[in-house]
Amino acid sequence: MAIMRKSHPLMKIINHAFIDLPTPPNISGWWNFGSLLGLCLVLQILTGLFLAMHYTSDTLTAFSSVTHICRDVNYGWLIRYMHANGASLFFICLYIHIGRGIYYGSYLYTETWNIGILLLFLTMATAFVGYVLPWGQTSFWGATVITNLLSTIPYIEQDLVEWIWGGFSVDKATLTRFFAFHFILPFIIAALAMVHLLFLHETGSNNPMGIPSDCGKVPFHPYYTTKDFLGVIMLLMLFLTLVLFFPDKLGDPDNYTPANPLNTPPHIKPEWYFLFAYAILRSIPNKLGGVIALVMSILVLALLPYLHTSKQRSLSFRPLSQTLFWVLVADLLLLTWIGGQPVEPPFIIIGQVASILYFLILLLLMPMAGLIENKLLKW
């Protein structure tokens, strides 16, 4: 078997990626989230496939088909809640994965990092179109509000919005195409994840010290397969607790009301994992400015490799930058909270200050802290 795993064309690829892969000996639990994201993706594709067998993408029957899945299909309620909460789990792992990349300077592997940003955009798009499918109140109005943001693009605004809608409002054509997008995008994400891994394995993994570890690498199996398996067990325990005890904790009660174009819900807000971006969008009174800020809140990550001023890669030995990093985390939690609040004082000003601080930390304060730390260390 040992010979076959190294000689067989197909087994050889798996061997180089997951068995004999040279890995730094000191990578911590924060490196588990890549494999956990892979698990989440597989889980979402499988549960989604079973849901698609019973779902109908028609405005008249979409809501009742979801009800049918929960009531009449064997374990349909479980599959539906696993899929809905699996998205939340996916984004928790995704944000921790990105946070680890920022903390330990993994963004200096620019190809891997940029494909990661593309994966983030695609995952957000998939989650958005998926949220529209149950055709509840928040589904319908969320789709209306977010697709309307495209009307800020000069000259082609009306044509573009109507093209996305497939008519003059969010209706049957919109739901059908969103279902098609929601079905195909995870497979594109899976293909891009392979490319993400391909580029990562060209350079090898980073480590908490941020220094080359070529002289002391260990094989991925059994060390990190075992470690990843521990992460998988812990994640599944958290996931099953959420699904079986608090399935609706992260959802919106308004989505249990069928979509009604004549009745606007009092507060239209996206799922919790988009609230930080939604808060940044709302913090700017101008529509076009808000959309630019929304896109830049993610695209700003692509600038990190070019704003790295420190002579050290990781934040492990840089207390100033560490402080800024944790302020950034607190700021994002604050933005998430603000995104779920109504647009009224004092939430408006808190959201604006938090949005400014977000961009200020990433674009100005972190690079400045890197330069100051270089001076302090006499480098």
Curated annotation (Swiss-Prot):
The keyword Transmembrane helix applies. It is a multi-pass membrane protein. Heme b b566 binds at H97, H196. The chain crosses the membrane at residues 33-53, 77-98, 113-133, 178-198, 226-246, 288-308, 320-340, 347-367. One of its GO terms (biological process) is mitochondrial electron transport, ubiquinol to cytochrome c. GO terms for molecular function: metal ion binding; ubiquinol-cytochrome-c reductase activity. Heme b b562 binds at H83, H182. Keywords: Electron transport, Heme, Iron, Membrane, Metal-binding, Mitochondrion, Mitochondrion inner membrane, Respiratory chain, Transmembrane, Transmembrane helix, Transport, Ubiquinone. Binds 2 heme b groups non-covalently. Its cofactor is heme b. SUPFAM superfamilies: a domain/subunit of cytochrome bc1 complex (Ubiquinol-cytochrome c reductase), Transmembrane di-heme cytochromes. InterPro entries: Cyt_b/b6_C, Cyt_b/b6_C_sf, Cyt_b/b6_N, Cytb/b6-like_sf, Cytochrome_b, Cytochrome_b_C_euk/bac, Cytochrome_b_N_euk/bac, Di-haem_cyt_TM. A ubiquinone binds at H201. It is found in: Mitochondrion inner membrane. Pfam families: Cytochrom_B_C, Cytochrome_B. GO terms for cellular component: mitochondrial inner membrane; respiratory chain complex III. The cytochrome bc1 complex contains 11 subunits: 3 respiratory subunits (MT-CYB, CYC1 and UQCRFS1), 2 core proteins (UQCRC1 and UQCRC2) and 6 low-molecular weight proteins (UQCRH/QCR6, UQCRB/QCR7, UQCRQ/QCR8, UQCR10/QCR9, UQCR11/QCR10 and a cleavage product of UQCRFS1). This cytochrome bc1 complex then forms a dimer. Heme 1 (or BL or b562) is low-potential and absorbs at about 562 nm, and heme 2 (or BH or b566) is high-potential and absorbs at about 566 nm. Component of the ubiquinol-cytochrome c reductase complex (complex III or cytochrome b-c1 complex) that is part of the mitochondrial respiratory chain. The b-c1 complex mediates electron transfer from ubiquinol to cytochrome c. Contributes to the generation of a proton gradient across the mitochondrial membrane that is then used for ATP synthesis. Belongs to the cytochrome b family. This is Cytochrome b.
